Design a protein with these regions (language model features):
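Short, flexible loop segments at the rims of nucleotide/cofactor-binding pockets, characterized by
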Residues: 13, 41-47, 71-75
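Flexible glycine-/small-residue-rich
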Residues: 37-40, 98
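Flexible beta-alpha connector loops of hexameric P-loop NTPases
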Residues: 39-48, 117-122
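Conserved G1/Walker A P-loop phosphate-binding module
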Residues: 1-38
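Conserved C-terminal guanine-recognition region of P-loop GTPase G domains, centered on the G4
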Residues: 27-30, 53-138
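Well-ordered mid-protein domain cores that form the structural environment of catalytic cofactors
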Residues: 19-21, 35-36, 49-55, 64
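Short acidic, gly/pro-rich beta-turn/loop elements at beta-sheet edges
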Residues: 34, 46, 106
């Protein structure tokens, strides 16, 4: 939704939003691309097993995978599992994106007017980015 600057898919503070594959076409200046939104992982073991099969079916169709990781999330074992067992086995490019930087601790220091992190947040964002780089480095 942030990418499209509006509510394109349902969002909930409690429940997962995307349950099936959703595709959106972006067009402009004589070019177009299709963005494929897949359900996120880590909701439950049953859902992860279902999504693993879905990912295996869909990933070969994709040219690039953007794998989103929240800046304030330290529980990355499910992401690591999908990276090692599904994503890394494919032939598409994978780009890990650290999101929701404004929630990085100390979150009360985020500069809302300037839309930028405090020096302490900036350091934590840098460390998070480096940790993601190390964890998801190709073997």
């Amino acid at each position: 939704n942030a990418l499209f600057q509006g509510e394109v898919t349902p969002v909930s503070d409690v429940h997962a939003g995307t349950r099936e594959v959703q595709r959106f076409r972006l067009s402009g200046h004589g070019h177009s691309m299709v963005i494929t939104d897949l359900p996120g992982v880590g909701e439950s073991r049953d859902r992860d097993a279902e999504y693993e099969a879905l990912y295996r079916d869909i990933l070969p169709e994709l040219d690039l995978v953007l794998w989103l990781i929240k800046a304030d999330d330290r529980a990355l074992s499910v992401d690591e599992y999908f990276w090692r067992h599904i994503l890394q086995c494919g032939h598409q490019q994978v780009l890990f994106v650290v999101t929701q930087a404004d929630k990085t601790e100390p979150c009360h220091e985020w500069d809302m007017a300037g839309i930028q992190p405090s020096p302490a947040q900036e350091q934590n964002i840098r460390e998070k980015t480096e940790a993601v780089f190390r964890l998801f480095r190709p073997v």
